[in-house]
A protein has these predicted regions:
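ATP-dependent adenylation/nucleotidyltransferase module used to activate substrates
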Residues: 2-256, 263
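ATP/NTP-dependent adenylation/nucleotidyl-transfer catalytic domains that generate, transfer
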Residues: 2-14, 42-44, 254-269, 274-397
Length: 397
């Protein structure tokens, strides 16, 4: 049979995304088992990369529905306390951050102090970081970021996607004012996309290599972003030259994952919690005093409720990540992630807002300065009356 071309693959994938929940659930089960079987044949181990709600549900789905005995691995210390609690209840392996040259571990504050704040998006942050660190080697790329004009390597394009969105050019393009003859602003803080690498990506990848293990991921193409096209091109299971991974939920939408969450949470509340408690005691991971969470849904998400039209939603956070991550913050309605952090952990909020970094004069500063600069409200007393943070989708690019 002739291999499907890229467009045919994407069209076939999109068609599967339109199928009902029951089809997607069964499809995920089939693909998950196929991945395990193929890995077994190749002599590979496998694990679940666990973070927030989607991957927590994937872990339970693989164990309790697919019958696949697979460990969960996470950089848990980056997650919200309520997520960490669920991780502990499930026996998720916590992988520490990378070590620095001085032997200490990288922390959120150390990464941001040295490299910069993760703000807007990974793509935009990486471009701003290049502007803040000019060299002869990245001269052509910096020109493209400001003007959209690419050289021979980029096909001599005009108005290419390399150019920053005008909103971000205005705020971050000032590093090239003299070179490009423009009049943009520049902040007095650094911007970077390196946090994920130092705090969770590289260390979890290293764990995988050390254990000859490849990951199951809780990714969905419906979330969009850079991974969406890759998922639609390569499907749920991918065995490449340098990358091997499974994303059983790749064809799921938000409603599908919330339906499955309610289903898995029902299992948890009807005997599964006790099963994991006994296993944790037996393995010495928890003590008898450890209070198992009543729900698989971490408290940061609230509960899953249904609108009059039947649409499911979480009453608190819709998405989560590292508590100090600012990617996408400008797209969120208030109360946004930092507002919710103020409610759940005011001490951490205060540290992140005002004390996590020091300027050249030794004065403390934090996310409050960054959010002010990009026009996102953060003062808890202004919730409901401050909509500065709301932008359109183009601002995310």
């Amino acid at each position: 049979m002739e291999r499907l071309g890229t467009y045919e693959k994407i069209a076939s994938f999109i068609q599967k995304e339109k199928q009902p929940y029951e089809f997607k659930r069964k499809y995920a089960q089939i693909r998950a088992k196929e991945f395990a079987t193929e890995c077994d044949g190749r002599g590979l181990n496998y694990h679940v990369s666990v973070g927030g709600l989607d991957s927590i549900i994937l872990y339970i789905f693989l164990h309790e529905v697919c019958g696949i005995d697979v460990p969960g691995v996470s950089a848990s210390t980056l997650e919200d306390k309520s997520i960490q609690r669920v991780h502990k209840a499930l026996g998720i392996i916590n992988v520490p951050p990378l070590k620095r040259d001085d032997g200490t571990y990288w922390t959120k504050a150390k990464v941001i102090q040295e490299f910069g704040f993760p703000v807007i998006s990974k793509e935009v942050a990486a471009k701003v970081e290049l502007l803040q660190n000019p060299s002869e080697k990245n001269k052509t790329v910096r020109h493209a970021i400001i003007t959209g004009e690419t050289g021979e390597y980029g096909g001599w394009q005009k108005n290419s996607k390399m150019q920053l969105n005008q909103r971000w050019l205005k705020l971050f393009g000032g590093y090239e004012n003299e070179t490009e003859g423009c009049d943009f602003q520049k902040p007095d803080f650094l911007v970077s996309a390196k946090c994920c690498y130092y705090l969770k990506e590289k260390n979890c990848d290293d764990w995988g290599k050390e254990h000859n293990s490849v990951p199951y991921l809780g990714l969905m193409a419906s979330e969009g972003g850079r991974r969406a096209k890759s998922l639609r091109m390569n499907g749920c299971n991918y065995f490449g030259a340098s990358t091997i991974r499974s994303a059983p939920f790749a064809i799921f939408g938000r409603q599908d994952i919330l339906k499955l969450t309610l289903e898995m949470d029902g299992l948890w509340k009807n005997g599964l919690k006790e099963k994991y408690y006994e296993a944790g005691l037996k393995e010495g991971r928890i003590t008898e005093k450890f209070k198992m969470p009543d729900s698989l849904i971490p408290e940061i998400y609230g509960t899953i409720e249904k609108k009059p039209d039947g649409t499911l939603y979480t009453t608190k956070a819709q998405r989560t990540g590292c508590s100090m991550c600012g990617f996408g913050i400008h797209m969120e309605k208030r109360p946004h992630r930092f507002d919710l952090l103020h409610e759940s952990n005011p001490k951490e909020w205060n540290y992140l807002m005002f004390h996590m970094c020091k300027d050249k004069d030794g004065n403390d500063y934090g996310w409050a300065k960054v959010l002010d600069y990009i026009g996102v409200g953060w003062d808890p007393s202004t919730i409901g009356g401050n909509c500065k943070g709301q932008m359109n989708l183009e601002d995310f690019m």
